[in-house]
Design a protein with these regions (language model features):
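Eukaryotic acidic, Ser/Thr-rich intrinsically disordered low-complexity regions
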Residues: 116-143
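HEAT-repeat alpha-solenoid elements in large eukaryotic scaffold proteins
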Residues: 20-29
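Alpha-helix N-cap/helix-start positions at coil->helix boundaries
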Residues: 18-20, 42, 54-59, 76, ...
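Amphipathic alpha-helical scaffolding segments comprising HEAT/armadillo-like alpha-solenoid repeats
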Residues: 2-13, 36-52, 74-86, 108-119, ...
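Mid-length scaffold segments of soluble, non-membrane domains
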Residues: 37-40, 56-61, 71
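PEST-like low-complexity intrinsically disordered regions enriched in Ser/Thr/Pro and acidic residues
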Residues: 1-7, 25, 64
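Hydrophobic core/packing positions within alpha-helical solenoid repeats
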Residues: 29-32, 36, 67-71, 102, ...
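Conserved hydrophobic register position within alpha-solenoid helical repeats
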Residues: 25, 64, 97-98, 131
Length: 143
């Protein structure tokens, strides 16, 4: 809970010159967010969204995605970052996990639109199928 340590972790999460320190920092920040301790809107959450959107390492993007999960229902920026990952991440495991994280916001029309796009256009048949199944579940719950 030390603000100085948090500041250093955020700085290391943004600095890719030392890949191991970068990945470890994202991991620690993500763990803190999942535990609910230090991920209020601001630098930590933003660092995880940047890592999810732009990091070359799938492992780092995965950790960032996991850290953002508790905030998808409350933070439009997080929701948009997860939807962007679903549409654009090159790793099918990350796209698949992104679908699973959307449950708290499944009734949101923008979420359904993205899922429909993925169900129709994703290169990976498994992801298309998971998206269709998710949309079917949402349709049944709405009716």
């Amino acid at each position: 809970d030390d603000p100085e340590i948090r500041r250093l972790l955020v700085a290391a999460a943004r600095d890719r010159s030392n890949p191991r320190a970068h990945e470890n920092s994202v991991d620690v920040l993500a763990q803190e967010c999942r535990s609910g301790r230090v991920c209020a809107k601001g630098a930590v959450r933003n660092a995880l969204m940047v890592a999810l959107r732009y990091d070359r390492s799938a492992a780092v993007r995965q950790k960032a995605l996991e850290g953002l999960q508790p905030y998808i229902g409350d933070d439009m920026g997080v929701r948009d970052a997860v939807l962007e990952a679903l549409l654009n991440d090159p790793d099918p495991d990350i796209r698949t996990e992104a679908i699973g994280l959307l449950t708290p916001v499944e009734a949101d029309s923008s979420v359904r639109e993205v899922l429909q796009t993925v169900a129709n256009q994703d290169d990976n048949p498994y992801i298309r199928n998971v998206s269709r199944e998710f949309l079917e579940q949402v349709s049944q719950q709405i009716q």
